[in-house]
């Protein structure tokens, strides 16, 4: 009976950690998509000051969340996202709004892709 109790406790702990990680991943991706979409809106207005401030906010948020996101995702995805975030910051400083919007949309797509690939499904589990 002791072994069964221990096994059930370990199973419940594993499930709780998995669900918690999944929820945390969703929040991280949602917050980052929101930040990047704010950059897109500012860049479409071609407002240099607002675009710079939105980029700075997104960069701060990225710095806080990228290490945790790296725990949940493939490292090649993280490398691509890191490159995109650096390019976004540089394009904002250079006031290259068309290319900035393109890179922002690509990063939003990457965050959506991470959400989709990490969503539990029969294909992902088996």
Identify the meaning behind each predicted range:
Residues 1-41, 52-126:
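C-terminal-biased regions
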């Amino acid at each position: 009976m002791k072994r069964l109790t221990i096994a059930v406790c370990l199973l419940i702990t594993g499930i709780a950690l998995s669900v918690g990680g999944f929820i945390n991943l969703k929040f991280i991706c949602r917050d980052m998509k929101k930040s990047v979409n704010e950059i897109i809106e500012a860049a479409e207005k071609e407002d240099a000051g607002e675009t710079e401030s939105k980029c700075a906010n997104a960069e701060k948020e990225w710095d806080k969340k990228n290490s945790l996101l790296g725990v949940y995702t493939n490292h090649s995805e993280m490398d691509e996202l890191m490159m995109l975030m650096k390019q976004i910051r540089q394009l904002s400083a250079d006031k290259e709004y068309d290319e900035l919007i393109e890179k922002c949309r690509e990063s939003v797509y990457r965050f959506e892709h991470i959400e989709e690939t990490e969503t539990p499904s029969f294909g992902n589990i088996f």
